[in-house]
Amino acid sequence: YARRYPDQQPADGQRIPALREVITLLKDRNKEAVELWREIKTSPEKPGSTSSPQEVAEAVVQLLKSEAATNPVRLLSFDWRALTYCLDTHSDMPLIFLSTAGGKTNNLQQGQPGASPWLAGVDIDDYGGSVPRAIQSLGGRFWGPYFKSLTSDQVQEAHGLGIQVFPWTVDDIDDMRRLIDMGVDCIITNRPDRLLALIKRR
């Protein structure tokens, strides 16, 4: 891990904070404008490892309500079942449909028979492999593609369908510059310092 992120400053003894702790920290520091992006990490390929995507999504939403979180919130997931549940029950919350066509989490499963278990019943091949069209069919408005596979044509297609594009996870300045030139709406990054510096220079 340290080799992958050599610039990261270690913090011995620190653990990943619970969502409630994050909300409390933002309240204590009067950071109501900071957006909370919460990824729902469930897998249809390992159904016994977590609660159902619907249960996890509902637990997150209820915690936000019980803590009276005033920060803008977005939920994102590779498991579109969590997002379609929220579309039905919490339609006012921005939902980002994550996608990737390779690696450990190939949630699109293009060219394979039937619907991908990740896509809430959608068979991506029914839409000619178009992720924006598949998201639109579910009522979604935000797409989070893996940045290396994103093309300008896909960005234009998504925008034509009223879908904003938020590629992940972009840490290299040249990649950031290329994606900004494509016209993406947001960039998900581990290095906001680099992205902000680039935006200021443009």
Q: What do these predicted ranges mean?
A:
Residues 1-102, 115-127, 136-146, 159-161:
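Metal-dependent phosphodiesterase/phospholipase catalytic core, i.e.
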